[in-house]
Swiss-Prot record:
Disruption phenotype: No visible phenotype under normal growth conditions. It comes from Arabidopsis thaliana (Mouse-ear cress). Expressed in root vasculature, root tips, leaf epidermal and guard cells, pollen grains and radicle of immature seeds. It comes from the Eukaryota. The keyword Transferase applies. This is Adenylyl-sulfate kinase 3. Catalyzes the synthesis of activated sulfate for the sulfation of secondary metabolites, including the glucosinolates. Essential for plant reproduction and viability. ATP binds at residues 37-45. The active site is at residue 111. It holds the Pfam family APS_kinase.
Length: 208
């Protein structure tokens, strides 16, 4: 039985330093870049390239990688429906804290269910939640299969694998959609530049 949300006699402690002051210190605005898509669509590749490009510009970011988080924060969760919901909820809460700290948080997760991603959007200030949809075909992702997971899923060795025997619900109103070109995933630098262009246009890379 989950005890999430059942705590009593607790009170919110306000910080003496607010988000505005932290953003001024960093000369940037905190936000969450939420990268979603099938396994093998290039989420982690984009996250790493984006973080590197931001660092080169003197901007502070941090990557929340779905696999990495299952080594620690979410190591008690499996892949049942309720575990997947809790997985995304926890990551959303952590991402919210990073954004509040003034960082550009890059969350890279399959996050297959639309309602869970929308819940994270509601959790974070809407204008500070940037959903990036890696719109790569199942055929391309399965051909790439960098972790060999599709092969295992096709062989019946992995159950509930997104795109094979569990659905992926595409975003309806994402801020950025990255598509394959001529059956290939765009280059990491090209994808990162498109995201950075959006962040620049929306004023996240400076504090004014």
């Amino acid at each position: 039985m989950s005890t999430v949300g059942n705590s009593t006699n607790i009170f919110w402690q306000e910080s003496p330093i607010g988000k505005t002051e932290r953003q001024k210190l960093l000369n940037q605005k905190g936000c969450v870049v939420w990268i979603t898509g099938l396994s093998g669509s290039g989420k982690s590749t984009l996250a790493c390239s984006l973080s590197r490009e931001l660092n080169n510009r003197g901007k502070l970011s941090y990557i929340l990688d779905g696999d990495n988080l299952r080594h620690g924060l979410n190591k008690d969760l499996g892949f049942k429906a309720e575990d997947r919901v809790e997985n995304i909820r926890r990551v959303g809460e952590v991402a919210k804290l990073f954004a509040d700290a003034g960082l550009i948080c890059i969350a890279s997760l399959i996050s297959p269910y639309r309602k869970d991603r929308d819940a994270c959007r509601e959790m974070i200030q809407n204008s500070s939640f940037i959903e990036v949809f890696m719109n790569m075909s199942l055929q391309l992702c399965e051909a790439r299969d960098p972790k060999g997971l599709y092969k295992l899923a096709r062989a019946g060795k992995i159950k509930g694998f997104t795109g094979i025997d569990d659905p992926y619900e595409s975003p309806l109103n994402c801020e950025i959609e990255l598509k394959e070109k001529e059956g290939e995933c765009p280059s990491p630098v090209a994808m990162a530049e498109e995201v950075i262009s959006y962040l620049e246009d929306k004023g996240f890379l400076q504090n004014e």
